[in-house]
Amino acid sequence: MDMNRLTQKSQEALQEAQTAAGRMGHTEVDGEHLLLALLDQEDGLIPRLLQQAGTEPKELRAAVREELSHRPKATGPGAAPGQVFVTQRLARLLDAAEREAKRLKDEYVSVEHLLLALAEESSSTAAGLLLKQAGITRDSFLSALTQVRGNQRVTSANPEVAYEALEKYGRDLVLEARSGRLDPVIGRDAEIRRVTQILSRKTKNNPVLIGDPGVGKTAIVEGLAQRIVRGDVPEGLRDKTVFALDMGSLVAGAKYRGEFEERLKAVLSEVKAAEGRILLFVDELHTVVGAGAAEGAMDAGNMLKPMLARGELHMIGATTLDEYRKHIEKDAALERRFQQVLVDEPSVEDTISILRGLRERLEVFHGVKIQDTALVSAATLSHRYITDRFLPDKAIDLVDEACARLRTEIDSMPAELDEITRRVTRLEIEEAALSKESDPASKTRLEELRRELADLRGEADAKHAQWEAERQAIRRVQELRQELEQVRHEAEEAERAYDLNRAAELRYGRLQDLERRLAAEEEQLAAKQGENRLLREVVTEEEIAEIVAAWTGIPVARLQEGEREKLLRLDEILRERVIGQDEAVKLVTDAIIRARSGIRDPRRPIGSFIFLGPTGVGKTELAKTLARTLFDSEENMVRLDMSEYQERHTVSRLMGAPPGYVGYEEGGQLTEAVRRKPYSVVLFDEIEKAHTDVFNTLLQILDDGRITDAQGRTVDFRNTVIIMTSNIGSEHLLDGATAEGEIKPDARALVMGELRGHFRPEFLNRVDDIVLFKPLGERQIERIVELQFDELRQRLAERRITVELTDAGREVIAHQGYDPVYGARPLRRYISHEVETLVGRALLRGDVQDGATVRVDAEHGELVVTYDQPEDVKGAWAA
């Protein structure tokens, strides 16, 4: 027999038969070895055919192994390992298989021909007897083969690819809907109706669903499958089935030229043979264009066109707007064969309805209860804060993750119990150490420790018992919910089959009984938990808000008591750091309070301010302090020095370079920073130095609270505080300040006039407040000196060195280090030169030891720094 006429799987089976014979110590490879190899083949056709014929392959495999185990084995010095001979019977079997292939008009000898040859053998052979005992005859096997193979012939070395191609490379959505595996589809009636209209057409009956990712395109097709199951479709669609084709598995593993085309042709042949009963659904339709195309090969899109044009193939596609434009619209011949169905993002109200429909499924899966307020919160918060994704997908994800978080907490040890367990472990280690000591103090401590341990162990046991009881109760509730859903599904099936007795028994018998038991279990669980519950099994709006905060970094949870107090005291906290600028502090604080209390305009930033004033009066310091107070870190401040944006070509760096330019992939310095930290202070330092085109960019941010970057992504600025600092008119503020530090009305008018001369009206009109910073007086400078020394104290605290500043020293530093033109900035330089340098030298020389006290004083108008060592060793030097 010509071995080249064997298919790939047949050759593998013969090779495996030879290997099995050698492994078992047999010198000859026979028909039983071949039968075992056919049964053992991974993803093989024979086990599937035997199951179709009503035989269990595992039992037959065990019987063949049992038979082979009784055969004589070649052992000892005369045995030649690895040397296996083919029996005459096996050679005759191969010839018989070749005859079977000719009889079936096949070009290659496949595995089914080999099994037919084995089934044709008489009962005198072990293989023939075992197959007959298993109920496999030539006729029964041919019947099963016809069901799987249809009218296809073996024309290639890998024919299994073409058998049951739809089952292999697709999912039957109607079957899944009938078995209750699909989630319910709420709404989308207009889109499903439009799809059914297009499918009912004579030609060009191929709808393509186009919409943003996550709006529910696939759900529409699942909804159609569910309607087909319910019979809620036109007469022409009643007996149809929907197969979702998986392009990934169709392409995966296609190693050789033509293998992909062969698989797709097999799928299309099955669809054609079904004579319109199969609707083919291709998710991500754009993957069809170019799929499988290599040099000289035809891509999937071109293979589909003839069948689509003739109406032999009913296809439903789904893709996004961008992918449709990029791939499908370029191929006009393919595009005209599809009818577009645009799928818009649902409204918040529709999303809430969708979530209510999915609630029961999520509750059953996670074993938790979801409050209706949590669903409303998920829809509204995701719409408001997660702007780069689409409803209902992002809202469903929120609820799903909130449920998963609670489920994880239920399965993990509660924090209270975990803390007690850790304390018990720590005390047990201490007990083991103290038990080795013999002194009276250790013995006394040991007795106390053992009493404490006994109390803690008792508490831990009680908590553990409570935890287990609550977990068991939650598990019972979950099992009842699952059973309830199963009974509902069975009742629906019975109603579809018009088995009204069964439906009535389920609906008015078991279903009501289960609902009563579930209500009783939930009451029992609530009573068990009481006030001192360890586990939470109800998803509330608080959990949803926590997930949103974790995703976006925006604190959307309801204000906690501590945060409420902090916000009410925000102006006091800011005044501790920003000295002498009460008006600026009040305006900024009011904006934050309006935002966090939820009464501001949700379409604009939290607040936008222009800070005007001379250098060194606290404009940048206020922005830093605000970031530190609100977000616990100055890292949440996006600072842009506008002197870097003086030229026109540098403006593109804010939003990213346009396509085709270097740096396009990196995004903009402003937009990327805000995308990563959407809840932050954005500081545009020295705004007057920026190019005028920068203000065109800022107009949209200030008015709409959003901007589109170079890559087309919308960046949300609605949760940012925008601060722009400027030195415009600072000379008027310096000259026009009263002795008390107040700004004269005429000086204010001059500053505003100069401001209007520099910035356009449409820009100034969009800013919430223009804040004038007053020049600092000597009293404020003295308070700033104290703040600077607080920073020095913190730096020296690691070495336990304390710094004392006398009133005289403070006055000298304030007098020497202050310049009205430069503000408070020279203070830092003065302290650095006159104090920090001297202390640094003393530390290096060893004059100041750890634990010493450094005193900064003044004598005769000169600064004097002295130090006290812990051993009362003193030294002094004049500055």
UniProtKB/Swiss-Prot annotation:
The keyword Signal is assigned to this record: no
Annotated region (C-terminal), positions in chain: 776-879
Location of region: Repeat 2: 86-151
Clp R domain: residues covered: 3-151
Localisation per UniProt entry: Cytoplasm
Region (NBD2): 563-775
Keyword Magnesium: no
Location of region: NBD1: 164-345
Family: Belongs to the ClpA/ClpB family.
The protein, known as: Chaperone protein ClpB 2
UniProt organism field: Streptomyces avermitilis (strain ATCC 31267 / DSM 46492 / JCM 5070 / NBRC 14893 / NCIMB 12804 / NRRL 8165 / MA-4680)
Lineage of source species: Bacteria, Bacillati, Actinomycetota, Actinomycetes, Kitasatosporales
